Amino acid sequence: MGSGGEGLAKRDFLQITDFSRKEIEQLFDLAKRMKARQYRDTPLSGKTLAMIFAKSSTRTRVSFEVGAYQLGGQALFLSSKDIQIGRGEPIPDTARVLSRYVDGIMIRTYDHAEVEELARFATIPVINGLTDLTHPCQVLADIFTVKEQLGGWEGKRIAWVGDGNNMANAWLEAATVLGFELRLACPEMFEPNIAKYEAAKKTGCVMVTEVPEEAVEGAHVVNTDVWASMGQEAEAEARRNAFKGFTVDRDLMKLADPKAIFLHCLPAHRGEEVTADVIDGPQSRVWDEAENRLHVQKALLATLMS
């Protein structure tokens, strides 16, 4: 049952900058123990996570639902069509009501302002499962994968090739907190959020270019995402034209460090943002990356909801 009482102390996770470097490192230590099956606690016993989906998903839904179950709790799937928020009920009302019923909320939606409003009025933890602005849970899992595969992010160059979308913005948030080198290659008019970029420049070594080769040169991690995200289907053809030359292929990967790894948050469109021989090749770590969503989010749930 939810905490119910107004004003009780709680912690939300809406963007990566909500956590300090030390907190992220502690989260990763816990996720590592969970992945190694060295963690046997059930901190979510008797607790329920409400999962609100305005955007459909495979990895977000399954990883959070399985994660809650493995921690002793349960997850309640709520599509926007199933609850009154989809019919115009004010978000503050939904936040207050859910706070009386459940112990945490994960929301995956379009408008980031909706997540902020939900968190402002909920008295239980709110987790951003994705918005059009940022995708913090995914990038946490990506950085955990970098640490797992390469030993850490210190001294590593991370490259992003493609749309300056919510994933690129979340990488900028991570660079703000962790201070690693980040190079983003995006076509003109598809650059990342300017506020995220300016914040990252203050603490990290960050560059935005229109030339993919500049971003990938010497990189230890090469990242990309689909060119047209969910809700942008009408723009797909125009985006394909705009992103010509931004495909991560074998020739582009040759410019990276010889031991570089390739990451993609999935779903992937082979032949568009990445070629099959890269995403299915020996440098790809996308399946480890996808698995790590489960472990990192379990650590997040245990931290926020226990």
Predicted feature residues:
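Phosphate/diphosphate ligand-binding glycine-rich loop within oxidoreductases
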Residues: 38, 42-147, 270
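Glycine-rich phosphate/diphosphate-binding loop of Rossmann-like nucleotide-binding domains
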Residues: 54-66, 148-224
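Adenosine-phosphate binding glycine-rich loop
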Residues: 259-260, 265-306
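Phosphate-coordination loops involved in phosphoryl transfer and adenosine-cofactor binding
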Residues: 44-49, 154-156, 259
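Rossmann-like adenosine-cofactor binding region
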Residues: 201-277
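Short, structured coil segments at secondary-structure junctions
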Residues: 71, 101, 121-122, 178, ...
